[in-house]
């Protein structure tokens, strides 16, 4: 059991570290209590990382073309959504976060109200749109981080490409760091 806990902690660290190379917890041996790994902070919350720059580049171009963008972030224990929200709002881009705290039955209404109020970008966990939402208003989907569940990924990537979609194309971007 100890090996599984250590492996799980390593896997979580290795998956999230490229996106948030700061403020990561130490990996502690579950029996001895000794520190196994103390992740080095390679940046901080204020540092704009290369993946964030790429996301901003895509969003700027899409907003300039009059399109709306949905950004998916899978890791809920990080501050990625809050950081992306700040970066986009600093650019004057009207951005909202569709949080998991909004119950599924109210998400469509929540989204409709935000779009009517002029939201250009929505940031959410792909599980929030896994079922029941048509996202035809969004012609660009950016997977900033991806989880392990391919069903969720496929469902989220198809939310904008529905039978009643009138846009000539829907673009899906999956951002990642090379050699990771």
Give the positions of each predicted feature.
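Conserved Helicase C-terminal RecA-like lobe
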Residues: 2-122, 127-133
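SF2 helicase/translocase ATPase core recognition
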Residues: 1, 124-180
